[in-house]
């Protein structure tokens, strides 16, 4: 099987941030929610790309986190979970990610009401972003970047 030119993955459900390890009796324990989310992302990647080998070159990672609520978690913690989960399957090491673009999409505060006017969003309303409905999910795209060497070095 030929190596894909890029990896894409869409995971339904609310994106999960990387939790801080807790220390008990001198041992660091990763929260169960974080472990389950990392295992799920790893498994979904393997399911979609069973024969793919990890990229060995620099890569660009794009991630869109479509949330079910506003506010927390922080974007960097969401991205950390993705980077750590795909270590060894999409790329050899997350140090290869030299370019990234991450965005956290949150539901609109105002929705179009039944009376034809905007009103504050209520808990039972569908999720909308800029007026367009969506379901919470995570979208990831990983693309290899060409390795570059100066001309002087190539000739010698």
Task: Name each model-derived stretch.
Residues 1-156:
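Acidic, proline/glycine-enriched N-terminal capping motif
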């Amino acid at each position: 099987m030929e190596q894909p030119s890029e990896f894409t993955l869409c995971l339904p459900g609310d994106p999960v941030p990387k939790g801080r390890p807790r220390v008990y009796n001198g041992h660091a324990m990763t929260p169960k929610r974080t472990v389950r989310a990392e295992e799920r992302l790893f498994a979904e990647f393997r399911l979609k790309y069973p024969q793919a080998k990890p990229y060995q070159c620099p890569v660009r990672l794009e991630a869109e986190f479509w949330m079910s609520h506003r506010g927390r978690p922080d974007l960097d913690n969401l991205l950390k979970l993705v980077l750590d989960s795909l270590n060894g399957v999409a790329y050899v090491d997350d140090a290869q990610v030299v370019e990234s673009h991450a965005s956290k999409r949150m539901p609109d505060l105002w929705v179009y009401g039944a009376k034809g006017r905007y009103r504050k969003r209520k808990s039972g309303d569908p999720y909308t972003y800029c007026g367009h409905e969506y379901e919470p999910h995570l979208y990831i795209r990983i693309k290899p970047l060409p390795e570059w060497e100066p001309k002087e070095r190539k000739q010698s």
